[in-house]
Structure formats: structure tokens, C-alpha cells
Amino acid sequence: MSNVTHQPKIGFVSLGCPKNLVDSERILTELRTEGYDVVPRYDDADMVIVNTCGFIDSAVQESLEAIGEALNENGKVIVTGCLGAKEDQIREVHPKVLEITGPHSYEQVLQHVHHYVPKPKHNPFLSLVPEQDVKLTPRHYAYLKISEGCNHRCTFCIIPSMRGDLVSRPIGDVLSEAKRLVDAGVKEILVISQDTSAYGVDVKHRTGFHNGEPVKTSMVSLCEQLSKLGVWTRLHYVYPYPHVDDVIPLMAEGKILPYLDIPLQHASPRILKLMKRPGSVDRQLARIKQWREICPELTLRSTFIVGFPGETEEDFQMLLDFLKEARLDRVGCFKYSPVEGAGANDLPDQVPEEVKEERWNRFMQLQQQISAERLQEKVGREILVIVDEVDEEGAIGRSMADAPEIDGAVYLNGETNVKPGDIVRVKVENADEYDLWGSRV
């Protein structure tokens, strides 16, 4: 008689932003540690977990469709994530969902899984769980989540109502996780949160401990400590607080990547006030100039919203003028979309869709020209590139100026003698508005 027991199998669908990806990885790690197998096909799974996004209406729709697909293909579905905070909305469309939890409800998700698909009593697979946790990103880069929630109340955003106020992770825990990632082969750490520059504010920047040494709970201290790991460290979602100035010298010294992702959202003081965002555009331009003087290699990424309620042609022109003067390297632009529960929904003078579309096109046309000019300046120079993919035609990687998924790529045509995670020196030979082409030096 066989003593082989059935290993319970879980399907997993992860939607949304990198912060959601981190939540998914944490749940997956716990499941694998307990002896569950994670499978890629609905019909192989005993149950499916859908980690949802609910930030904008299109994301809500995508999440609802993913839940529906999981129900049709499998039938046993647990929902978690941001949209899970709106249980009634999910139940109205999908009443057969077994359980619904909100964001970062790891323990609740696991309890529900245990109820419907009991965990195996004996787990001989524990040692198979990678030391750096189960990752949904390639092995050579990883997201490092340093906090949850946000203290800001931007009128276009509902994240605080979904994820709550800022809660910083203990700096010792963050640094220990980073060390485990590096020990497991990670070459690039991407620091993420809802508001990276606010790290430690909620605990009054108290002193924590790592390896027996005192470390202040702050973004600057975190960067100084991460720089000792000898890998690329990239900062995302940095709110433009004054102390952001203090990380620029670390970038100039090569301690962390000269890359700053600062969502500025607009340039009209009036619109920024309606958004409840900081509104001194002249001050921001002066800071950008100062940052570039300290760190000439600095790459600046930002995101903007066009068609926000009340935006006039004059407001929009201020945004275009800001782009021309700031000459940002990487820019994302979104047409304003109402989000259920957001304060901006109640603002007067909603902008017609055709006007949003026209302004978005003008914005993108201008920024593409600026991006192309910025990248053209790199032609003839040598840069470091981290390799992401290799096939028979060559390799694709990213420079220090490129975050995965959202920025450009560096194409190394014909270069096959490398592997993902390698960092190589490349001479840039060509550029367009987004990407670079070059050869290994």
C-alpha cells in the first residue's frame, strides 16, 4: 500500500502594482513552507487565490474579470488585495466567491486556505523553499517593501482607505530580508512602498538594530545600510520631502543607483492644491537643478495626471512648460479616471474625455521628444547594463536608468555569452525615445 499523500495544490493570480507583487510573494512563501504546491493551471488546483487591484476603475474591472475566470475554470476562489476592501462590490458580481479579505491580510488568507484545503500534516518539502522566499520576479532582482499605507490624502487616490495610514517595517527586519535576498543571488533591490521617503515617520525615526548595531529608521539610513550589500539599490515612489536632498550625495558617491522615482502629478499650483499635493513648482525646478549639479548621472522618473477636474488649457500649458524646463528622463502620464471613493469625484468642472485624450497626446508627443534627446546624449558612451533575458538573437538588459517593467531596455544584438543577472559594460551605439542599442565592451 502506497504511503504517498496528496500534496494540496493552490493556483495563484497576482494583479496590480509591485507592492501587490510583494504581498503575493509573501503569501506564496507561507503556502510553500506549509507544504502546498503552487500550480500554474486552474484545473490542477484545489483552490485559487486572486490578489486584486482596486486603484482605478480599469483595474477594478480587470480584477473582477480575473475572479470570474477563476470561478469558471476552478470554482473554489478566495479573493484578497485592494479590491477585497470592497466586499459588497465583489459579492454583487461574484456571489460564489468563498472568502474575501482586504490588502495585507496574509494570516486571514492562510486561515481560509487551511479551512477549505487543509495543509498536509507531514511536510517533507520544507527544505525546497528558497531561502530568499518564493519570488514572482526573475531571480536577479527583487522588490523590498519597507512600509505599508500612506499618511497623505491626495484627492485622486483611495490607497489610504484601502491600506490605512503609514506603518513602517522595523529597519532590522528590512535589512535582514535584503541580506537574505543578496545571499540568494539577487543583484538589484527595488525599494518600494506607498511613500518611501516617509519611512520611519510613524515611529518618529526610532533607532532599530541590525547585526547588533543601532540604525535609525529613516530612508537615508536605510540607503546607507543597503549600499553595504554591494548590489544595485533603486528607490521608487519617493514623495518630494526636503530630506530627499540627503540621498542625492549617496547617489553621487555610487552607494545607490542615481535613479529617483518622484510622482509629481502636475505643475499647476491650482491643480496641485485641488489634488492636495505640494505646489511649489519653482522650488521643485530649483531642486532638480541642484540634484543634477550634485549628481550629473541622475535619472529622474515621474508620473503626471492630465484632465484632472478643473484643469484648464492654462493649467495644462503650465504642465507642458514644466516638462520643457525639467527635461525629465522617464515619464508616465495618465488620463484622469474617477475612482470610487476618491475626493476628486466631487470636484466641479470635470474635463470631457475628448479633451483628456487630446491633452494626453500633446503631453506624450512633447515628452517623447525630450526622452529621445536625453537618450541620444548617451550614444558613444559606456554604461553598465544588468542582463534580464538572453536568447539566440542576443541579450536584453537595463541600464542604471531603467527600472524593470516601466522604463526602457538596452538591446545587445548578437550577445549570447551572458546570463540573466550579469552586469556588463556596454558601449551605446544607437537610441530612440525609449531604448538603447549597444555592444559589450
Curated annotation (Swiss-Prot):
Q: How is the cofactor bound?
A: Binds 2 [4Fe-4S] clusters. One cluster is coordinated with 3 cysteines and an exchangeable S-adenosyl-L-methionine.
Catalytic reaction list: L-aspartate(89)-[ribosomal protein uS12]-hydrogen + (sulfur carrier)-SH + AH2 + 2 S-adenosyl-L-methionine = 3-methylsulfanyl-L-aspartate(89)-[ribosomal protein uS12]-hydrogen + (sulfur carrier)-H + 5'-deoxyadenosine + L-methionine + A + S-adenosyl-L-homocysteine + 2 H(+)
Q: Where does [4Fe-4S] cluster 2 bind?
A: 150, 154, 157
Q: Please state every residue range assigned to the domain named Radical SAM core.
A: 136-373
| The enzyme's E.C. designation | 2.8.4.4
- Membrane-crossing residues? none
- Per the UniProt entry, what is one GO biological process? tRNA modification
Domain spans labelled MTTase N-terminal:
8-118
Localization per Swiss-Prot or TrEMBL: Cytoplasm
Q: Which cofactor does it need?
A: [4Fe-4S] cluster
Q: Which interval of the chain is the signal sequence?
A: none
Molecular function (Gene Ontology), one example: protein methylthiotransferase activity
- Supply the Pfam families for this chain: Radical_SAM (PF04055), TRAM_2 (PF18693), UPF0004 (PF00919)
Enzyme class at the top of the EC tree: transferase
Which PANTHER family does the annotation name? RIBOSOMAL PROTEIN S12 METHYLTHIOTRANSFERASE RIMO (PTHR43837), RIBOSOMAL PROTEIN US12 METHYLTHIOTRANSFERASE RIMO (PTHR43837:SF1)
Function statement: Catalyzes the methylthiolation of an aspartic acid residue of ribosomal protein uS12.
Q: Which family is annotated?
A: Belongs to the methylthiotransferase family. RimO subfamily.
Q: Which HAMAP family does the entry mention? A: MTTase_RimO
Provide the protein name. Answer: Ribosomal protein uS12 methylthiotransferase RimO
